[in-house]
């Protein structure tokens, strides 16, 4: 609690498709650190603003409800409509985020943001943690878990900022190329730096 909880240190977790950012988020949660998922907050924001979005995007309404896939198809081929969507959803995401932060009252909070650098989030965070792995390894992981073809995975990769560029921008880079134990060790080193060695994970 105390005054420091009012202004938590917020660290963004990101990584390109198949990097293992969800594994890092799960490790942090298991060690007792709060991790917020920006995609989940965005889904809640869309739900909260559904009536407004239905008026703006009537073509994306299926059976009286806003169809997320139809909405995605509409906006990602039209920058103006994407801007209109973001104008409604982004302020609500920020409101929900502030609500969550005040509810948590934690001195250190992690925020999982898939498109952290692409969407310019780094200016709103105290630091950024990039989970990185070689492209071929990431492609293999995604194909194994999702059933997507190699071409589909590569198309998603091309839609993101190159990992090399993210490496230059990130505060910390976690190399996720070895075992889970290696990843845990690297993550604990970052935590020790963040907390002054006070709580670099348990065990």
From Swiss-Prot:
GO terms for biological process: coenzyme A biosynthetic process. Residues 10-203 form the DPCK domain. It comes from the Bacteria. InterPro entries: Depp_CoAkinase (IPR001977), P-loop_NTPase (IPR027417). Gene3D superfamilies: P-loop containing nucleotide triphosphate hydrolases (3.40.50.300). PROSITE patterns: DPCK (PS51219). It catalyses: 3'-dephospho-CoA + ATP = ADP + CoA + H(+). Signal peptide: none annotated. Pathway: Cofactor biosynthesis; coenzyme A biosynthesis; CoA from (R)-pantothenate: step 5/5. HAMAP family: Dephospho_CoA_kinase. Its EC number is 2.7.1.24. It is an enzyme of class 2 (transferase). GO terms for molecular function: ATP binding; dephospho-CoA kinase activity. Keywords: ATP-binding, Coenzyme A biosynthesis, Cytoplasm, Kinase, Nucleotide-binding, Transferase. GO terms for cellular component: cytoplasm. Catalyzes the phosphorylation of the 3'-hydroxyl group of dephosphocoenzyme A to form coenzyme A. This is Dephospho-CoA kinase. Belongs to the CoaE family. The keyword Acyltransferase does not apply. CDD domains: DPCK (cd02022). ATP binds at residues 16-23, 145, 176. It is found in: Cytoplasm.
